[in-house]
């Protein structure tokens, strides 16, 4: 929650 769904943010 707090962030829209989608692919993870790369490091």
From Swiss-Prot:
This peptide both inhibits the activity of the angiotensin-converting enzyme (ACE) and enhances the action of bradykinin by inhibiting the peptidases that inactivate it. It acts as an indirect hypotensive agent. Expressed by the venom gland. One of its GO terms (cellular component) is extracellular region. The modification Pyrrolidone carboxylic acid is found at residue 1. It is found in: Secreted. This is Bradykinin-potentiating peptide 1. Belongs to the bradykinin-potentiating peptide family. One of its GO terms (molecular function) is toxin activity.
């Amino acid at each position: 929650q707090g962030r829209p769904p989608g692919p993870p943010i790369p490091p």
